Amino acid sequence: NKMGIYIHNCIREFTPDLIVVDGEPLMIKSIKISHPSIKVVALLNPADVVNPNNNKEAMDFFNEFYSLSDLAIVHGIRRIDKDSRYTKFLSINTIIRSEIIGVENVPTNNIYCVLGGGTVNVGQLFVDSTIAIGQLCQKVASLLPQYTMHIVCSSQNIFNVLNRNSSSENVVLHDEIIPAEQYYCNAGLVITRSGRNTLSELAYLGIPAISFVSGCSYRKIEQTNNINDLNISTIVAANNDISPVAFADLCQKMMQVKKGEPMLPGNDEAIKSILHL
C-alpha cells in the first residue's frame, strides 16, 4: 500500500543502521526481505507472544514474523519467558512515554474519566461501552459534590452524546483528549479502561485508578489479565453494570488510598539492549 511504499522510500533515503518497529509483523517481514542488512528491533506486547486466549495458528503466524527481528523487546505488565524461535529476546516492564517520566502527581479533588482507547475503526460495542462509562460518571458526579468530575472524550461523537445529558455543576466535559501530563499532575483519581500503557503509567505515578473491563470477550480477558498481573492496591477493576451508588462509594474509597511503590519503567533496559545490538 501507499504507506508501505513511503516507509521503504524513507529507508532507502535515510539508510538507517537500525529500525524499531512497534508490532506490525508484516512490516518486519517486508523490511527483512528488502533490507536484509538493516537490524530490526520489534517492540511487542506480552500478549503478542504468549496468548492462550487467541487461536494457536494465529499466534504461530505472528511469532514467525516477529521472530525475524534481530531483537524482540516485550514490554508490559507481566514478564514472559524467552521463546526459542527468537534470536535475541528481552522481557521488561512497560516502556513509559518520555513526557510522563517527569510528571509529579499532587492529588487534588479532581477526578478524571478518560474515555480513550480509540473510537475510529472500532465496533459499536466499544462505542456503546465508552458512552456507558461516561454516562455513569455523569450520574455519579451528583453523588460526589465535593469533587470535580472531568470527563475527557476521545471524539466529538462521544462528546455530543454526553453533552445532551443533564449534568451537575461539578461535571466538566472535554470534547477532545487532553495531554495526559495535564491531568496526571493533579488527579486524585483516574477512571479509565484496562489497557497496558495507561495502567502502567498510573502504576508508575502511583495515582489511584478505577479501571473498566469492557468491550468484546477477547478484550475483556486481556484487560482482566492486565489488572490481575498488576496486582496493586492503587488500581482496581470495575464492570459497566456497577450501580451509581456503588461506584460513588468506590470512588471515595480509592481517593483515600495511599501511594505504593512505583512500578519502574523498562525504558533504561530497552535502550541498553538496543545499544548492545
Label every PLM stretch briefly.
Residues 149-153:
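Short beta-strand segments
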